[in-house]
Amino acid sequence: MKTLLEMITIEMKEAFKAAGYDEELARVTLSNRPDLCEYQCNGAMAGAKKYKKAPIMIANEVVEELADSKYFASAEAVNPGFINLKLAPEVVAEYLNEMAADENLGVEKEKNPKKVIIDYGGPNVAKPLHVGHLRSAIIGESIKRIIRFKGNDVTGDIHLGDWGYQMGLIITELKKRKPELPYFDESFEGEYPEEAPFTISELEEIYPTASAYAKEHDDYREEALHATYLLQNGYKGYRAIWKHIMNVSVNDLKKNYERLSVDFDLWKGEADAQAYIPDMVEMLKEKGFAHYDEGALVVDVAEETDKKEIPPCMILKSDGAALYDTTDLATLVEREKLYDPDQVIYVVDKRQELHFVQVFRCAKKTGIVKPETELTFLGFGTMNGKDGKPFKTREGGVMRLENLIREIDDEMYKKIMDNRTVEEEDARRTAEEVGLAAIKYGDLSNQASKDYIFDVDRFTSFEGNTGPYILYTIVRIKSILKKYAENGGVLDGTIRPAENDAEKSLMLQVVKFNEVIDNVYKETAPHKLCAYIYDLANDFNKFYHETKILAEEDEEKKKGYLALLTLAKKVLETCIDLLGFTAPERM
């Protein structure tokens, strides 16, 4: 289904052509003066020089060609040459009824769907999730849903940090505490225990203890580095511990991400890429891409057009150890081999941009990925506290993600109980649903690349540009529709042409849905989806306050209102699903 903007652009092209002008001048945009008109066309201004004519003359001639157009209630040429367009209410109503009948609400799927991998989340195992993990998870999940909604084949990969020095630290600390475990007995020949020798709580305490101790004791650090080396070279006792660490950690991570409504298709990590490193290194050497520089193996990725220095991509350190560059390149080798993606999107902290510039250039230069494969860096800014510094606990430490979620849920629970519209048990469940919307909308309503301030008081408010306000609007619509059905009403009406400004504004906002989705998709910009649903919620609430919906005596008119509300609800629910949260039945 074409967007309404596309349809009226086609109509304008015909008018320009009929008036003797280039149809490419017929560029229609939303009006920047909605008090005067809904859409505008400035093509006459652009054509004045080419046709050596006053723009107002061109505009008048084009407007004459629109006299019989069914699309416009009025088309007016105004000085110095703008064309102001007001849509015919019948056309808007007809379009909305077509949207309502379409399972995709008028959104056209990709004609040539792409195979896309989104790399997001990226936590290290054996460490608790903290607020720094929030943005990658929330933004990545929303982008995954948006790209999938347009009909693409999308795979979300968490890409765990599961293979580095932290593993050696945990093994070394465990050996210090429990030397009697069979994993540390080189002569042990039996089966290793199926049950892990630690809980998630113990594991989360072991790592920081070991990390702090290693900074003060060189011998301990050396032992941890050696343990990392043994693990990476297949020592079976340490491989068995590593499997326990992975199982315990991943089970806990799954619970935490489930609470955030974040769902990964792949739970792969750095460890999965290790098998691809030797052949990749050999290929880079054989084909002359890699060379040694001060003992390290590197690939030059600088280009003549660079405005700043781009250092070489480091493949192996002088001691032969692999690095992040190596692992990320090997992961691309693996992805090419197993999934053959058209695009790989990395949703990571924007401070990692240089690293990904190096990796992307190296992957393209060396043929690790095909020339046409899109490698996209989507860098996000920092989530800050009210002081403008990275978000911390009151004591100044890094806040665990589960504690932040609990704090938001408690705040929502208090506000819901103050309203006393739901039972206590329902209030807890509702608080979790609304709390998640507060967190996700609070983040996603900001442009991903910008830093933003996480303000608990503002994000949990039922007023203003917040998640709770959006949900409150949806619940209000649900309540009206439910009340009508409970009184024996049947929702079988069709949307009628608007009769007042509030109704017209709401209809024109709903009409924009597919256009907004296309734009959000092209720009990978969830913040634009948030801006849209905030405007839509405002237009609905204005209509609600100015219109007697259920008290309307004309049954056909009432059914028309309810058909419009049903469509607005579907649009809002689709949008919040793309943002990664849901609305309760009551609030």
Segments from the language model and where they lie:
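Non-catalytic interaction-recognition regions
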Residues: M1-A93, L105, E110-M587
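Short, charged, solvent-exposed linker or helix-capping segments at domain edges/interfaces
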Residues: E94-M99
